[in-house]
C-alpha cells in the first residue's frame, strides 16, 4: 500500500481529474474504451438474450451499484435501504464482494469481524444494521449461503454488483455523486463501467454542491448528512461537529471520493486541513503522528480498520446518514411485493 499522499494517491487523483474532461489522454485511450465497451456489451447481451441464465436465489434481490468507478455513496445508501426495508416489514440480508479482504468462499460478517477478513464496507454495514451480511467474490454463492444460514431473510440487498449479472435481481438502483458520468467515456478513457443509458429501476444522485438533479427518468436526490462525531477510543463520547469549528482539525479519508467527505464537513461549518488517502487504505501504521492538530476527523469506513492497538486520542469518527426519498422507498417496496407503484 502506498504511503499517504504517495505515488498511488497522486496517480488516483490525476486519473480522477482526467476522467472529468475530454483531454488528450482521454482521447488517446478511446480505442481501449471501445474494446472494453464491446466486451461489456457482449456480456450484458449474453444474459439479456438468454444465452446465459442468471441464478434465482429464491428471494427478491435489490442491487445498489454504480456505473462509474469510485465511491458514490453506495454504503450509506445500503444501510439506509436495509433500515427502510425492515421498517416496511421485510427481513433483509446483505451480500457483498468483500473488496480488500482475503475471501474466497462465502463468509459471514459480524460486528466482531476484522476488516482484513471481511472488507471495510461489509463490516461497517454489519455494525450499523445488525443484519446478516455475507461476503464472497461470487455473490450468488454468498446469497445462497446467507439464505441457508438465515432462512427467515426474505429480501437480499447486494452492496455493489450491478455488473454481476449472474445474480438475478428484482430491483436495480444506481448511485451517482456530483461527478455523474464524468467525461462520458468508458474505461479506461473515462470513469464509466457501462454507458449512462444503461437501464435501471431508479437513479440516486448525491450532489452536496448544487443539489441539482440530471434530467433522467426516475431520478431521486440522495442526501448524505453527517452526525455527531464519536471518539475512536470511547465511542460513547460524542461531540457535535460545530464544537470543532475553533480547533485545528485535519480531515482524512481513505474512500473512493474523499472530497465528498471534506465537502460534507465544510457544509457543516468546518474549515479543516484535508488529506486524501488511497481508497481502502490499510492503516498499517499511524499516518498522523507528525500532524500538529487538535482533532482528526475520519470516516466510519476507515474507522472499522483501526483496531484496539490504536491510541491516538485525537481521532474522531464522523458517521454519515443517507436520507432516502419516500417515493423511492415506495417504488422499491412495491416492486418487491410484485405490484406497480401507485
UniProtKB/Swiss-Prot annotation:
Q: Which NCBIfam families match?
A: lpxK
UniProt catalytic activity: a lipid A disaccharide + ATP = a lipid IVA + ADP + H(+)
Name a GO CC annotation attached to this entry: plasma membrane
Query: Per UniProt, which keywords does this protein have?
Result: ATP-binding, Kinase, Lipid A biosynthesis, Lipid biosynthesis, Lipid metabolism, Nucleotide-binding, Transferase
Domain of life of the organism encoding this protein: Bacteria
Pathway info: Glycolipid biosynthesis; lipid IV(A) biosynthesis; lipid IV(A) from (3R)-3-hydroxytetradecanoyl-[acyl-carrier-protein] and UDP-N-acetyl-alpha-D-glucosamine: step 6/6
Pfam families, A to Z = LpxK
Q: Identify this protein by name.
A: Tetraacyldisaccharide 4'-kinase
What GO biological process terms does the UniProt entry carry, in alphabetical order? Answer: lipid A biosynthetic process; lipopolysaccharide core region biosynthetic process
Name the residues that bind ATP: 68-75
Query: What role does this protein play?
Result: Transfers the gamma-phosphate of ATP to the 4'-position of a tetraacyldisaccharide 1-phosphate intermediate (termed DS-1-P) to form tetraacyldisaccharide 1,4'-bis-phosphate (lipid IVA).
Q: What is its EC number?
A: 2.7.1.130
Signal peptide positions on this chain: none
Task: Write one Gene Ontology MF term.
Answer: tetraacyldisaccharide 4'-kinase activity
What family does this chain come from, according to its entry? Belongs to the LpxK family.
Return the broad EC class: transferase
Amino acid at each position: 500500500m502506498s504511503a499517504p499522499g504517495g505515488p498511488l494517491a497522486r496517480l488516483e487523483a490525476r486519473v480522477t481529474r482526467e476522467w472529468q474532461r475530454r483531454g488528450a489522454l482521454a482521447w488517446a485511450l478511446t480505442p481501449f474504451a471501445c474494446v472494453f465497451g464491446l466486451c461489456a456489451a457482449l456480456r450484458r447481451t449474453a444474459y439479456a438474450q438468454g444465452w446465459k441464465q442468471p441464478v434465482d436465489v429464491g428471494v427478491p434481490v435489490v442491487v445498489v451499484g454504480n456505473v462509474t468507478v469510485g465511491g458514490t455513496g453506495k454504503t450509506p445508501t445500503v444501510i439506509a435501504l436495509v433500515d427502510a426495508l425492515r421498517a416496511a416489514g421485510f427481513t433483509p440480508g446483505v451480500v457483498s464482494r468483500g473488496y480488500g479482504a482475503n475471501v474466497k468462499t462465502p463468509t459471514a460478517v459480524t460486528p466482531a469481524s476484522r476488516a482484513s477478513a471481511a472488507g471495510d464496507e461489509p463490516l461497517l454495514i454489519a455494525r450499523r444494521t445488525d443484519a446478516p451480511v455475507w461476503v464472497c467474490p461470487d455473490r450468488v454463492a454468498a446469497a445462497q449461503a446467507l439464505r441457508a444460514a438465515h432462512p427467515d431473510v426474505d429480501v437480499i440487498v447486494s452492496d455493489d454488483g450491478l455488473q454481476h449479472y449472474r445474480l438475478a435481481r428484482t430491483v436495480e438502483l444506481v448511485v451517482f455523486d456530483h461527478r455523474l458520468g464524468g467525461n462520458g467515456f468508458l474505461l479506461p478513457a473515462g470513469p464509466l463501467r457501462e454507458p449512462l443509458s444503461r437501464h435501471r429501476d431508479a437513479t440516486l444522485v448525491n450532489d452536496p454542491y448544487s443539489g441539482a438533479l440530471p434530467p433522467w427518468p426516475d431520478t431521486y436526490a440522495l442526501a448524505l448528512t453527517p452526525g455527531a462525531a464519536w471518539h475512536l477510543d470511547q465511542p460513547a463520547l460524542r461531540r457535535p461537529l460545530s464544537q470543532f469549528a475553533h480547533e485545528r482539525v485535519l480531515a482524512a479519508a481513505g474512500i473512493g471520493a474523499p472530497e465528498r467527505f471534506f465537502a460534507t464537513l465544510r457544509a457543516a461549518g468546518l474549515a479543516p486541513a484535508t488529506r486524501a488517502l488511497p481508497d481502502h487504505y490499510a492503516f498499517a501504521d499511524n499516518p498522523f503522528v507528525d500532524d500538529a492538530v487538535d482533532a482528526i476527523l475520519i470516516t466510519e469506513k476507515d474507522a472499522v480498520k483501526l483496531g484496539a492497538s490504536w491510541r491516538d486520542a485525537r481521532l474522531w469518527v464522523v458517521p454519515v446518514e443517507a436520507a432516502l426519498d419516500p417515493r423511492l422507498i415506495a417504488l422499491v417496496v412495491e416492486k418487491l411485493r410484485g405490484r406497480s407503484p401507485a
